[in-house]
Amino acid sequence: MRKQNGKSDLSRRGFVASAAAATAVASVLPAPAVLAGGRPRVVVVGGGAGGATAARYIAKDSQGAVDVTLVEPSRAYYTCFFSNLYIGGFREWESIGHSYGALAANHGVNVVHDWAVSVDRDNRSVGLAGGGSLAYDRLILSPGIDFRDGSVPGWDLSQQNRMPHAYKAGSQTQLLKAQIEAMPEGGTYCMVAPPNPFRCPPGPYERISMVAHVLKQANPTAKIIIVDPKEKFSKQGLFEEGWQRHYPGMIERIGPDFGGDMVEVRPEAMEVVVDGEAMKVDVCNVIPAQQAGRIAAAAGITDDSGWAPIVPHTMQSRADENIHVLGDAALQGDMPKSGFSANSQAKACAMAVRGALTGSSVFPPRYSNTCWSLIATGDGVKVGASYEATDEKIAKTDGFISQTGESAELRMATYEESLGWYDGITADMFS
């Protein structure tokens, strides 16, 4: 793991160009023969960083040779990445919302706003909640996450309005922000953090930082408690340094050594029970254990882990060569579950799908990821790595991370870099 040293400028153009280069290296793999008959059909389920990117690149780069349909129930997509900044007051809600209109207008993607509820692998079709089905030659599943039933005793989705998860961006994010802002003076915010693996490893701890930022200004005697089943977490040294600097005495973390892995909640009483001891809280943000979005299990491509194993070079399901799985839902190896990862995987997948269906050139993929986090105003940190496809997994080849004790100028530059990345990736997904 190498240190972060120096300022880099990740503009929209630079992000798209560097990401494209990541999927192109010198040697060309043999391409399959072009399918006979009419245009081959690709159905993409899920319109996030994986699915929207895959749909856009297949449609754009095939220049109409492939019929691409994107199935996504929401007409506006709100990014989970940067939703913590909305909670912290650094972004307006509308700034993290995006529409699918340009995918249709600019690239001819057929956008179907419906839920995909079933997959008939024998007949290669996807069933829709609204009725009917969509036939495919290749299916790309990028459904994100669902929560594991019973992972936090006392909590299920029926309690999400009393104790929100806010880990799928949308009304839950807005609800949690409103609850934080309505806390009584000197009140207590509690987060029940998830076990590994889960979406966006630094995400819960950036959220803690953003909640602390809000409370420091509006409710400085409030307390924040993290109940955490994990012994350690992403960027731990950086977050703990930042919490001590910006929010001294406000944040307490209860790890597994003190019962953080033995928690239950009582939503009606607004209580959190840690190792048998109950405490009253005013806001409780429960982030449960996670698994692949339910359509992956419905397709029969998940294993006992709840995630969908894939072939690292193509993101194909190990259970069905005509299905590819992207992003959070994939069991792929060393890459974290992040929007950057999903976008990187989508480009490799799009290249593989075009090669299989049209005979276009296919290159060995290279993957990358960076996760930025904001701790306080202008105090940005990051962690990232490069990866390669092996026969067994997507394997990390090198990495970097911000360092404790960095200058304010470098931290501001890191935050500004994250803003450029956000503009770049959302353009890469939706333009």
Q: Can you name each region flagged by the protein language model?
A:
Residues M1-L10:
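N-terminal secretory signal peptides
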Residues D9-P30:
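N-terminal export leaders
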Residues L35-N110, P195-Q236:
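Beta1-alpha1 glycine-rich phosphate/pyrophosphate-binding loop at the start
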Residues N106, N110-S118, V126, L134, ...:
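A Rossmann-like FAD-binding core segment of flavoenzymes
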Residues P143-A218:
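Glycine-rich dinucleotide-binding loop and its adjacent helix/turn
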Residues L157-M183, A278-S344, G355:
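FAD-site-proximal beta/loop scaffold in flavoenzymes
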Residues A342-R366:
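Internal hydrophobic alpha-helix adjacent to the cofactor/substrate pocket in enzyme cavities
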Residues G384-S431:
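C-terminal auxiliary extensions adjacent to catalytic cores
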